[in-house]
UniProtKB/Swiss-Prot annotation:
Keyword terms, alphabetized: ATP-binding, Cell inner membrane, Cell membrane, Membrane, Nucleotide-binding, Sugar transport, Translocase, Transmembrane, Transmembrane helix, Transport
Gene name tied to this protein: ndvA
Domain of life: Bacteria
Lineage, uppermost ranks: Bacteria, Pseudomonadati, Pseudomonadota, Alphaproteobacteria, Hyphomicrobiales
Domain ABC transmembrane type-1: 21-311
Gene Ontology molecular function, alphabetical: ABC-type beta-glucan transporter activity; ABC-type oligopeptide transporter activity; ATP binding; ATP hydrolysis activity
Name this protein carries in UniProt: Beta-(1-->2)glucan export ATP-binding/permease protein NdvA
């Protein structure tokens, strides 16, 4: 994306308030153009006071400086008041749009598929969101206040100076040419460098976020010094990339300041000569010195504008790239709200591949009636989790159809489909908020009584009541203030509170002790009645009473039946059951031997 197209996209993000933005920009243009009247009045006053009335001064002739001075004061006060009003409105608009775009970005990334978040560091997404919206704010504010006015005021100033005195105007044109050539050279030199700088910033953010997210690992393996040194190394590479960019722009500042001084001195020198020849007045010399000062201000604004666009471009490109990411799964234009489902689920010849080559699911077909419990069994990577991900449309299959209550799930809105599905993940996911807030994720309007009932059914009420703040206890970042079993019980309570017709349990009792697991299984048996439940199981003891067990291998269902039927067949499931039984027996024997030895 070129700088021009990038800047155009920045202005498009003004959205519904773009019209107000253009009004502010045009107002600033008019105010910037009006500033040219001040040097003209100044020069005219000097001419009047010196008794040398010049022609073509754009001001009616007068022999008294007071009317001109009064006009200057009135005009100056008016422009100051208008400038303050426009600046205030510009600030408010830029702040409003920054918050609006930040919220839109946040909403957008939350809707992107899990596959996107799996491959993108959360620290990078936060950095892109904050730096991107800050860059947008600066660009908008610059557009409202300076960019548009600075560029177009040059178009007014140069012809005006030609009209007043073309000989002195030549010096202003030379100054413009020097600025243009120098700026073009520096932009060409630093364009790629700034992209490298932003890449190093991203690495710095990602590395710091990675270490902070794994503090326990860093401390337990005594990696503090190593991680700090790693951050120093990234910081060093960042400085190495940044210094050449700063040096080039420092050179621009030095040369432009020198050009400014030379131009002013040249105006005086040429002006004195022309005055001696009767080709200009003292007032015009003063006027052109003021013109030169204004021109320098405008040129510096243009240079700063180009510099800012160049500096912000990598951040803006990252931000817009994320904003333009299209979710692989989204609602169709004709998608409907399915309401509350009964729980009938059908997979019909479903196939799916992550990379388009090796199938993760191949020709999967089965039907789950309302109230059925379907267990999915198999080795890691066999396709169990992928099948469930397809059910709640984390992905769409390349072929085949998945139906709920006879409706293709692709014809149902994502929100209504997912409202009907409750999920208990193997790793409990909790917000850094109170226990009550975490439970209300399942039902935002849940009453305190409903919270207590759900917690009680999930065997969580006891530890909640033991805490000092009860349901107001903060769970900590990712639930770190709670034990693994406590987090999992809250996750189960949240799913029960949602009361969905379809329930997914991804080894939901894996983090619980044997006593709590036994209690929880009784509660789950009661809750699962009348619901279609899918259980991703690794411990076969948890699926003893499943309506049907699907045994996965390399994306295919190789066996299907009840627990007893599959064991009787002596196939893959029976081998897995025997292996787990032998492991459990070995563990029991080892524990018994240890106990006997102590006796």
């Amino acid at each position: 994306m070129s700088l021009f197209h990038l800047y155009t996209r920045v202005l498009q993000l003004l959205g519904k308030e773009a019209r107000l933005g253009w009004i502010l920009a045009v107002a600033n243009l008019l105010l910037a153009t009006a500033q040219f009247a001040e040097p003209i009045l100044f020069g005219r006053i000097v001419d009047v006071m010196s008794g040398n009335l010049a022609t073509g001064a754009l001001v009616p002739e007068t022999r008294s400086p007071w009317p001109l001075l009064g006009a200057w004061v009135g005009f100056g006060l008016f422009t100051i008041m208008c400038s303050a009003l426009v600046a205030l409105q510009a600030d408010r608009l830029a702040h409003r749009r920054r918050q609006a775009v930040l919220t839109s970005y946040f909403e957008h990334i939350l809707q992107l598929p899990i596959s996107f978040h799996t491959g993108t560091h959360s620290g990078r997404l936060m950095k892109v969101m904050l730096q991107g919206t800050d860059a947008l704010w600066r660009m908008w504010l610059g557009f409202f206040r300076e960019h548009f006015a600075a560029i177009l005021s040059l178009v007014v100033l140069l012809p005006l100076s030609l009209y007043i005195n073309w000989r002195l105007a030549i010096l202003l044109f030379v100054l413009c040419i020097v600025f243009t050539v120098l700026t073009t050279l520096v932009v060409h030199k630093t364009y790629g460098m700034q992209g490298e700088v932003e890449a190093q910033y991203s690495d710095l953010s990602a590395r710091a976020s990675d270490a902070l997210g794994n503090v326990a690992l860093v401390q337990s393996f005594v990696r503090v010094d190593a991680e700090v040194q790693g951050l120093r190394n990234v910081s060093g590479r960042l400085l190495e990339a940044q210094m050449p960019v700063l040096s080039w722009w420092a050179l621009v500042t030095v040369i432009t300041r020198a050009s400014t001084t030379i131009t002013v001195l040249s105006i005086f020198a040429l002006g004195i000569y022309l005055n001696q020849q009767g080709l200009t007045s003292v007032g015009e010399i003063v006027m052109f010195v003021s013109f030169a000062t204004l021109l320098i201000q405008r040129l510096e604004q243009v240079v700063n504008f180009i510099n800012n666009v160049l500096m912000e471009a990598p951040r803006l490109r990252e931000f817009i790239a994320v904003l333009d990411t299209v979710p692989a799964v989204r609602d169709r234009a004709d998608a409907i709200d399915c309401g509350r489902l009964s729980g009938l689920v059908e997979f019909q010849n479903v196939s799916f591949s992550y990379d388009g080559k090796r199938p993760a699911i191949e020709d999967l077909s089965f039907t789950a009636l309302p109230g059925d419990t379907i267990a999915l069994v198999g080795a890691t990577g066999a396709g169990k989790s992928t099948a469930i991900a397809l059910l709640h449309r984390a992905f769409d299959p390349q072929s085949g159809v998945i139906k709920v209550d006879g409706m293709d799930i692709r014809g149902i809105t994502l929100a209504s489909l997912r409202r009907n599905i409750g999920v208990v993940f193997q790793e409990a996911l909790l917000f850094d908020r109170s226990i009550a807030d975490n439970l209300r994720v399942g039902k935002p309007d849940a009453t305190p009584e409903e919270l207590r009932l759900a917690a009680e059914r999930a065997q969580a009420l006891e530890f909640i009541e033991r805490s000092d703040h009860k349901f107001d206890t903060n769970a900590g970042e990712r639930g770190r203030m709670l034990s693994g079993g406590e987090r999992q019980r809250l996750s189960i309570a949240r799913a029960l509170l949602k009361d969905p017709p379809i329930l997914i349990l991804d080894e939901a009792t894996s983090a619980l002790d044997a006593v709590t697991e036994a209690k929880l299984n009784l509660a789950l048996d009661e809750v699962m009645k009348g619901r279609t439940t899918f259980v991703i199981a690794h411990r076969l003891s948890t699926i003893r009473d499943a309506t049907r067990i699907l045994v996965f291998d390399n994306g295919k269902v190789i066996e299907s039946g009840t627990f007893d039927e599959l064991v009787a067949r002596g196939g893959a499931f029976a081998q897995l059951a025997r292996a787990q039984f032998m492991v459990q027996e070995s563990a029991r024997s080892a524990m018994s031997s240890a106990a006997d030895a102590q006796l």
